[in-house]
């Protein structure tokens, strides 16, 4: 443990892992006040910037890769502070949307503003649509009840499961989740709502998503955090219809590489899955979403014999939906072109899809109750097609669960990422 003294106006940047205890004085952390006796835990691959309000002293314990830097200025740009004053002049309730590339400090900026408005007595909320940060694969709503030091360390007020750490291929789910979280914010009387968006900003699909989000949210102000007008392609179409405010990136922003980002996602999933147990459902006990499976009729009798004759073996599980025929095995079994042609002749309007237990096992899922509320994460550990049983590793109690929403990320039960699979792979 070492003692670090900091004067009013100076900033101490602490890279984790580290433990900080305020020994004396008053400070701020992203706009949140911290005082004598307060403790801050900084995890590996994260950092905090503690700014002295008065002359202060901190007791800091550093881990193996932790370190401390002292700056004689604030890491919060003056323009950010001025924006808070500008937004405070808006009629409440208001919505502010934030655009920015990765590593521009959007989330830090949003957290700072949320803390300031909370301390100004406003009912304050944050909607995070950044699927790769915080809670992986979720769109989250936070209603502030105290100032926030790190949104990843508090429980969301509500959440929507997308099931991917990127919005690419999941734009519709992002839109739906964002709309639901905004409606929830309205229902609880949020006066100042800040919407943090993903750093996906290049390419026509990113353009389309950002355009759709603006049209959906209809913000009172669009805040663009950029270095050198690199987001001009996104905002120029809105200059005549939306109030756009350009903000600089903090010069002290720290870059995170892919390894750091992956580590933080895995750490979050590991934390969320801790204390889990396995639960098993019969297919008939629960609804499946984002999957063809369990949405049709299980084949038996003459039709089953016909399908077995075409594929030249007896499948473990065959399900016919209005738009697809599913054949399930324990292991992936590709069909020959000859067999596919026979299927097309026999069922000209129904494509065939081969699915396997291998594809489904280790898929990250969202568990939902009867009111369509997200309850928590789960990981598929086993699926038995013959018995129509699915087993999930989760901290959520079985009695609460009404439906399973399948994601496109495969992870181990302790949260380590394995691979990404295409949506509707099974």
Segments from the language model and where they lie:
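Conserved lysine of the Walker
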Residues: 106
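Walker A/P-loop NTP-binding motif
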Residues: 113-119
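Nucleotide-state-sensitive switch-loop elements of NTP-binding domains
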Residues: 75-93, 97-99, 121-195, 200-201
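The conserved Walker
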Residues: 102
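Phosphate/Mg2+-binding loops and adjacent switch elements
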Residues: 184, 188-245
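Conserved mixed alpha/beta catalytic, RNA-binding, or beta-rich assembly cores of soluble enzyme
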Residues: 138-142, 199, 210, 341, ...
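Preference for solvent-exposed, low-hydrophobicity sequence contexts
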Residues: 1-94, 98, 112, 165, ...
